[in-house]
Amino acid sequence: MNELIKHKLELLPDSPGCYLHKDKNGTIIYVGKAKNLKNRVKSYFHGSHNTKTELLVSEIEDFEYIVTTSNTEALLLEINLIQENMPKYNIRLKDDKSYPYIKITNERYPRLMITRQVKKSDGTYFGPYPDSGAATEIKRLLDRLFPFKKCTNPANKVCFYYHLGQCNAHTVCQTNKAYWDSLREDVKQFLNGKDNKIVNGLTEKMKSAAMTMEFERAAEYRDLIEAISLLRTKQRVIHQDMKDRDVFGYFVDKGWMCVQVFFVRNGKLIQRDVNMFPYYNEPEEDFLTYIGQFYQDTKHFLPKEVFIPQDIDAKSVETIVGCKIVKPQRGEKKQLVNLAIKNARVSLQQKFDLLEKDIRKTHGAIENLGNLLNIPKPVRIEAFDNSNIQGTSPVAAMVVFVNGKPSKKDYRKFKIKTVIGPDDYASMREVIHRRYSRVLKDGLTPPDLIVIDGGQGQVNIARDVIENQFGLAIPIAGLQKNDKHQTHELLFGDPLEVVELPRNSEEFFLLHRIQDEVHRFAITFHRQLRSKNSFSSKLDGITGLGPKRKQLLMKHFKSLPNIQKAEIEDIIMCGIPRTVAESLRDSLNDPPK
């Protein structure tokens, strides 16, 4: 078991879901389901196993998981994932015929039946269901609700079920094709969750039976209503409409966004895509950018429709994507979007938790890093990063690691003061100059190593300030990221060269942690500053609203939209005079000219 798996095992949730074991090439070699992901996945790596399982475990280099909201959901998702990926250690399932369906036959008097043979020309099929027990339970309920043929009697001879109101396959009922087609549609609507009409009808019958003292019959109706209520806990991973759709959910935290996409094909959730990246604007804006880039990639098939969360503007997405965009409001479809959001949150939290656990791997990392760079052991490391969007509110940040752990009391933020426009090199020069002039002036402890989040240009700028302006001899390294914002290369030396850094080494984990932390700290500060500047600029020019009162409003309401929604009395409660509060409301609510 490698270190990555050890850490990920500690972070597994106590939730139902599916897990996907992968080999060294990232290929899915086994898909499983679990009532409790933590217990089930851990069991592979502890205790004794049979020969087949030991062979599987020997090939596992990584795993991922998808959280579901029920055990049955996990089972149905497992079916879909196995059929889509055909992992070599799973039982090979050629098609859906291994699973039971409920069928309405195309006979003159249609019947409800359970079958594993799908021939679409001879009936209407619903499913597949995870096992025969689930299919039988649902069919039993359908038999009580819908009067399909339930007997072998000739049409002119009524049966026992006819007297119960559960079989209309008799000439005395005078049914025609339109009647049975309507009944077939009622079943379809019912299984798709549109059961209010039936429940309301049963409720009225129950009340009527109770009023006439027919308590046994009232109890039967009550039991039917309860059975329907149980069925309402439907599976969100299979949809009867058989449509192709992509379902998006996202979650943001600590300057990072995680987007999860569920790929639903022929009504089945068969795959998911996960992407995590730092975001710089409002989350909704960066999500729109992401979804546009997602479908520009030719490998992504454009489905019939795309589901998005409530806070995203559907018209904007439709303009970008070019297909039907849906923001589900309720029911099964809304729950599927919520499931994508939940998995995005879980994935992002796992990323942060793994980074926290990486701190434990710093034993020996500092010494190894010193040996790698041929410098004394870097006990104190100071790292820098710039953050700006098109030159607006440019800032920089410094984080400090002592003995491989963050020393947050030593973190520093910098507003860029001398640079106009987006100029990373000039910004880096200003920040390094300000930091180390203060170190010299105040007699502060200099670092053993400076790490710059950037490439050759930024490192050379920092070196020029440190060596030529201050005459200091502090080693400086650069960390470059790839196009996925992941730690990619370590630059060091004079001239700068790429230092080979094994990705499974302790020193790589330390540098990865430092780079992520300084980036998080910088963009969080940048976002706060932009928000504050935007807030203040829109309050400028309002008579009687000076810096102190703006600060009071910012502290209490957090954002302009909150002020716009606030009542005058709420604003006055913050210590703002009534005349100023009224002027403020009028100014914010006036349409732009």
Swiss-Prot record:
GO MF annotation list: DNA binding; excinuclease ABC activity
Domain of life: Bacteria
Domain UVR: 196-231
Entry-linked InterPro entries: GIY-YIG_endonuc, GIY-YIG_endonuc_sf, GIY-YIG_UvrC_Cho, RuvA_2-like, UVR_dom, UVR_dom_sf, UvrABC_protein_C, UvrC
Family annotation (Pfam families): GIY-YIG (PF01541), UVR (PF02151), UvrC_RNaseH (PF22920), UvrC_RNaseH_dom (PF08459)
Record keywords, A-Z: Cytoplasm, DNA damage, DNA excision, DNA repair, Excision nuclease, SOS response
Localization annotation: Cytoplasm
Main location: cytoplasm
DNA damage in keyword set: yes
A Gene Ontology cellular-component term: cytoplasm
Single GO BP term: SOS response
Protein task: The UvrABC repair system catalyzes the recognition and processing of DNA lesions. UvrC both incises the 5' and 3' sides of the lesion. The N-terminal half is responsible for the 3' incision and the C-terminal half is responsible for the 5' incision.
NCBIfam families named in the record: uvrC (TIGR00194)
Oligomer and partners: Interacts with UvrB in an incision complex.
Family designation: Belongs to the UvrC family.
Protein name per its UniProtKB record: UvrABC system protein C
Primary gene name: uvrC
